[in-house]
Amino acid sequence: MQRTWKTLASAAAATLAAALLPSVAVAQAPVKIGVVLPLSGPNAQFGINSRTGIEMAADAINAAGGIASLGGAKIELVVADVPSPNTAAAATQRLVSQDQVVGVVGAFVSSITLAASEVTERAGIPMITHSFADQITSRGYKYIFQVSAKATTYGKAQFDYAIALAKQAGAPFEKVAIFYEDTAYGTAQAKGLREAAKAAGITPAIDEAYPLGITDVAPLINKLRASKADIVFPVSYFNDALQIIRAMRQQKIDIPTVGGAAGYIIPDFKKGLGEYSDGVFSIAPANYDFIPELNALYKAKHGTFMTHEVIMYGAALHHLAKAIDVAKSRDPEKIRDAIAALKICDTGFAAGIPGGCTAFDATGLSSTAYPVFVQWRGDDLVTVFPAKAAKGPAIWAGKTLN
């Protein structure tokens, strides 16, 4: 697999996977992998981006010859559009029972992943996800794997990184506001924020959930203004992220804003807000400036930078494909064991994840990934913290930090 990754920058065709080097004369039946994502509804853009990463990885593996140990069998993606948790179980069951997939990748939205993984666990089918919620790998399940850190880790880092930068800028904060969408992702990440604030001796001036799909953020923003908070930590998907930042800017609430990933770190955030996005910080699970050569190839084709979902789900598919190759089998149990044992580092999509690897602990949680801080600068997101990962300086309260 390593050889193909080394040719990424120069390959004319998109080569975004490891070379599995088969040489066979007889065509093998494809290896079916299920893909569960919200391709319609309010989170469709996340699902579309995630599917792009999965398809890029699968296409390149197939172009390189397929799964070597299975005689060059090609990967066949079986995609299910799952816009809400209510449809996740039935859609995933169809993939397992009718399509007989050997593994599943998805579903970005934590509440959808929680529902889908109930089905894969009962069926004994491995699933790899980038969803954040702590519950995903805290249920004692055997067949679910998270390529990212968990949500409370992101929440804690979201707060602790902000404290570090504010202190460096000579502008420490005392009054904080926490807003979060009320599904599994937002609730878990807000818990991490809350715990970090408590550890710092700070009681949030605002700590408020709002419903997913909110259409009027005016009450939240009015509370923010009245609180006289020094900083705000919103944990949002996409439409809610746009509404919160737009309302803040329109009401000239000019305080450091640290988003909770998701809607704050995709190109559509900039498209939707224009100059209002400038200077906004966010926690992030990955960033394209870790893999500039891959990003250049992606941008030439898609016109935007490679998003975190593309990186994380490309890495997830790559890990699953390598596990199938190592297992030398279509048996989901053997594939599951190979997923758990594998550690893939510093190659392809995995290099775009802080920590540089896809690898898992005994619970299925990533054993290497950690969050980074990114900041909007014009059309770009720059990784600015921690120092070991930074690709540029942070600008905090108007001060450029070294």
Where are these regions (language model features)?
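Cleavable N-terminal signal peptides
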Residues: 14-15, 25
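Sec/Tat signal peptide C-region and signal peptidase I cleavage site
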Residues: 20-27
